[in-house]
Amino acid sequence: MAKRDYYEVLGVAKNATDDELKKAYRKLAMKHHPDRNPDNKDAEEKFKEIKEAYEVLGDEQKRAAYDRYGHAGVDPNAAGMGGAGMGGGFADAFGDIFGEIFGGAGGRRGGAQVYRGADLKYALEITLEQAAHGFDTEIRVPSWEHCDTCHGSGAKPGTSPKTCRTCGGSGAVRMQQGFFSVQQTCPTCHGTGKEITDPCPSCDGVGRIRRNKTLQVKIPAGIDDGMRIRSSGNGEPGINGGPSGDLYVEIHIKPHKIFQRDGDDLHCELTIPFTTAALGGELQVPTLGGKAEISIPEGTQSGKTFRLRGKGIRGVRASYPGDLYCHVAVETPVRLSDEQKAILRQFETSLNDGGDRHSPQSKSWTDRVKEFFS
């Protein structure tokens, strides 16, 4: 089944701003969140689709690639796109093409081709509490690193790579085709300018080995879902002396049992008994900083919202914390005994004797229905 257009998934125009994208994403994510739609497979699939769309459109580089190439531009399994990293390969491919046509550029004229290491991406899943308060953590990132045995040379210890006999160490050869002289990557040394006659036993002459490296990462307080933390130089090592790439730690916040986040604000559903709604009372509600008291006035209806200022999250760049919004849901009692039902019927009779004084909204609704059918 073909994927839907990501802009269509979020219901925004292709020129939508970052704020418009974020607002649309949060609205749809809250609507289709699995916690709000238990045992609903359709809602679960829609939530995944919405999350996937925002992960692409909410990232400047991925959005540019998607706008130009469609789904293929952001699919790591698409032909020619590569899946290990975000840097180096794509630009270098174009460099190789134009270098072969027009005589080479960027490093070939003075020696072997130099490549910057690929950027790495690491997805880190954290809780809402961790996002709010910040913390330090340790991550293990799979990456290519210089071989310790040969120190990245690719040659067996005690030996050294030799200058390539084909290209003389330049990493490129020039081919004469009629009136044109075309420069190409050396087929013998593959652009390194060196030949390895006795390869390193640890890396088989590659000069790099695959291993997990452990890094300490500081997660700032107030970080939001989809934000990225850049760790300079902790990507994959460069080739032929090129600089290392960067590591991008992308934050994913787990769904919370109570709260939904909207920017720096938090929202929760406050379920109260119908007796408390009618008579009023004091209730304790949870916050990320502990408990708070809410005074429920008499006659509170479902849908009423209580705002607790400063009980939200203080964003990474915010001066003040957001607010907590508690949305009331009045619970109707179930599994009543015969005695309880009799008491309620007696109570209902007393309400009816009072006319519309006790239930003005119900009376108003009844009047509107009568007018509709009259």
Swiss-Prot record:
It comes from the Bacteria. The keyword Metal-binding applies. GO terms for biological process: chaperone cofactor-dependent protein refolding; DNA replication; protein refolding; response to heat. Zn(2+) 1 binds at residues 147, 150, 200, 203. Signal peptide: none annotated. The J domain is necessary and sufficient to stimulate DnaK ATPase activity. Zinc center 1 plays an important role in the autonomous, DnaK-independent chaperone activity of DnaJ. Zinc center 2 is essential for interaction with DnaK and for DnaJ activity. Participates actively in the response to hyperosmotic and heat shock by preventing the aggregation of stress-denatured proteins and by disaggregating proteins, also in an autonomous, DnaK-independent fashion. Unfolded proteins bind initially to DnaJ; upon interaction with the DnaJ-bound protein, DnaK hydrolyzes its bound ATP, resulting in the formation of a stable complex. GrpE releases ADP from DnaK; ATP binding to DnaK triggers the release of the substrate protein, thus completing the reaction cycle. This is Chaperone protein DnaJ. It comes from Bordetella petrii (strain ATCC BAA-461 / DSM 12804 / CCUG 43448).
